[in-house]
Amino acid sequence: MISNPKYGWCNFELGDFKGSPSYLTDVPVDLLVAFIDQHAKGRGVAWFDEEGTEFTLVLTPYSMFIIEEKESPVLHDFSEINIKDLEKELIEDLEKDLNGWSEFITDDDREEILQHSNEIRQKIVMLKEMI
């Protein structure tokens, strides 16, 4: 789902959709919160800035969409994808490169990186408990 957190950019793939979110949004935390909210509130949203374009992941109990904002809005329907499988994939992607994701939106401040790492870990634990 997400990979390659380098130089303030990463890769996002869902079905046939590909995006390149930037450091302007906290990609790992925003995704974790969207999935946690979907369990807790019945809906979750994560918005991503690609610096010139943007896209939004929308989760409901029965559907999953990406709204792509380029020249004109495009709606991608991923309702056939199993959300639990996607949650497991997200957790695996984050745990595979926790150091890279911890540094994604931070400067070289070691304390800030540690805090971000702890936040990601805590949210992973929360999501695992909900799956």
Label every PLM stretch briefly.
Residues 56-131:
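Long protein-protein interaction modules used by eukaryotic assembly/scaffold proteins
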